[in-house]
Regions:
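Active-site entrance/lid segments in N-terminal catalytic domains of soluble metabolic enzymes
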Residues: 1-85
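Conserved active-site-proximal phosphate/metal-binding subdomains
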Residues: 45, 55-75, 79-90, 98-204
Length: 204
């Protein structure tokens, strides 16, 4: 989730005022307290990524109500909030940008950029196993699920064939990283490694 103490943790770093800092939010409501905290250190973020409910991976919504939200509305809410508060911070639309037409619509509505990730999982440059790339390429809507098996405890969107599903993984995460079990293992990573071992012939 959004760590409200991020600026406090970084404020003593020599590059605190030089390096670009961006945050990811899923609502204007989540943005408000972060900006309030950041203003204390005279260091607002350089850009804001607004991630919608159709993003791959972790979601900033509840497991039961993510379908009630849409990226266009959230981006507009954030843009209105920034304008009302006279904050000139670039906004990046993410999570549900499927086509060039989508990208143009967001840019024309006021976003400074768009973020596209899942589309590139099937490219040659992507390091996923070839079998997994084919799963992405051939997936239809029914092959995509939202669940709470992530070690973070947050809802996440994944393919139904994910090796994490059915592996017995339970939420066990703290703010600063995954908790290891008594033997020093991370269940999430172990599930991934098992998948690699079972499908070595498909890894390029």
């Amino acid at each position: 989730g959004l760590h409200l103490g991020s600026m406090e943790l970084m404020k003593e770093h020599p590059r605190f005022h030089d390096v670009l800092i961006g945050i990811i939010v899923s609502s204007a409501r989540a943005l408000r307290p972060f900006l309030k905290r950041a203003a204390k250190y005279k260091r607002l973020p350089d850009y804001i990524t607004v991630e919608g409910p159709l993003a791959g991976g972790h979601l900033g919504f509840g497991a039961d109500d993510w379908q009630e939200y849409d990226l266009k509305t959230i981006v507009n809410d954030v843009l209105v909030f920034l304008k009302e508060n006279e904050l000139n911070i670039p906004v990046v639309s993410a999570g549900g940008v499927f086509s060039g037409t989508d990208a143009v619509e967001f840019l024309e509505s006021g976003a400074s950029a768009v973020q596209v990730a899942t589309r590139f999982t099937v490219t040659h440059e992507c390091g996923l196993p070839e079998k997994t790339k084919h799963h992405y390429l051939e997936a239809v809507e029914d092959d995509i699920v939202v669940n709470t098996i992530s070690p973070t405890g947050y809802p996440m969107r994944m393919l139904r064939q994910s090796p994490g599903i059915g592996s017995g993984i339970r939420p066990n995460c703290e703010a600063f990283g995954y908790i290891l079990d008594s033997k020093g293992h991370c269940q999430y990573v172990d599930a991934y490694n098992r998948e690699l071992e079972e499908n070595t012939e498909n890894i390029s």
